[in-house]
UniProtKB/Swiss-Prot annotation:
Belongs to the purine/pyrimidine phosphoribosyltransferase family. GO terms for cellular component: cytoplasm. It is found in: Cytoplasm. InterPro entries: Ade_phspho_trans (IPR005764), Adenine_PRTase (IPR050120), PRibTrfase_dom (IPR000836), PRTase-like (IPR029057). Pathway: Purine metabolism; AMP biosynthesis via salvage pathway; AMP from adenine: step 1/1. It comes from Borrelia garinii subsp. bavariensis (strain ATCC BAA-2496 / DSM 23469 / PBi). Keywords: Cytoplasm, Glycosyltransferase, Purine salvage, Transferase. It catalyses: AMP + diphosphate = 5-phospho-alpha-D-ribose 1-diphosphate + adenine. GO terms for molecular function: adenine phosphoribosyltransferase activity. One of its GO terms (biological process) is purine ribonucleoside salvage. Catalyzes a salvage reaction resulting in the formation of AMP, that is energically less costly than de novo synthesis. This is Adenine phosphoribosyltransferase.
Length: 176
């Protein structure tokens, strides 16, 4: 996937010391304020994935939804939601993951993932890769195969791609 950092960087708000001191937060919600930029993001992802064998798109709560939902409509593919623990009403598979300050848990409905389906996993940002790795494990435990991972932004200096080495990982914007 072609690096589009120079173009998209001007539309991504950078918030210092959020959510805690010393962290620079890349806020993609500013991209949503420019329909032509938001459309461009979805079209870039569509162009890259349209010809790949993908059966469904899975998205990580919550900003992954902003990319995955319009892309699934454009590609006419089912959308599978990965949510934080306790947010899904039917029977679920769950997967714990480590946070800086403890542990979290994500879940997916057991009947949302078809056996052996080829899945495109989407989140807004790749930092440590922990959430995406847990999401991929969760989807595979549910019977799917994660074929690709797409993130709008990748923080290359953190090297989250390292723990995702078993997957094809693509991003449009790369920050060092």
């Amino acid at each position: 996937m072609k690096n589009k950092t120079e173009y998209y960087d001007q539309f991504i708000a950078k918030v210092p010391d959020f959510p805690k001191k010393g962290v620079l937060f890349y806020d993609i919600t500013s991209v949503l304020l420019k329909p032509e930029v938001y459309t461009s993001l979805i079209n870039e992802a569509y162009s890259f994935y349209n010809l790949k064998k993908i059966d469904c798109i899975a998205v990580v709560e919550s900003r992954g939804y902003l990319i995955g939902a319009p892309l699934s409509l454009k590609m006419q593919l089912p959308l599978v939601l990965i949510r934080k623990e306790g947010k899904l009403p039917r029977e679920v598979f769950g997967e714990e993951y480590e946070l800086e300050y403890g542990f979290g848990k994500i879940e997916v409905h057991k009947d949302d993932v078809r056996m052996y389906s080829n899945i495109l996993l989407i989140d807004d940002i790749l930092a440590t890769g922990g959430t995406l790795k847990s999401s991929a494990i969760l989807l595979e435990r549910a019977g799917g195969r994660v074929k690709d991972i797409f993130c709008f932004i990748e923080l290359c200096g953190i090297n989250g791609r390292r723990i995702l080495e078993d997957y094809d990982v693509n991003s449009l914007v790369r920050y060092n």
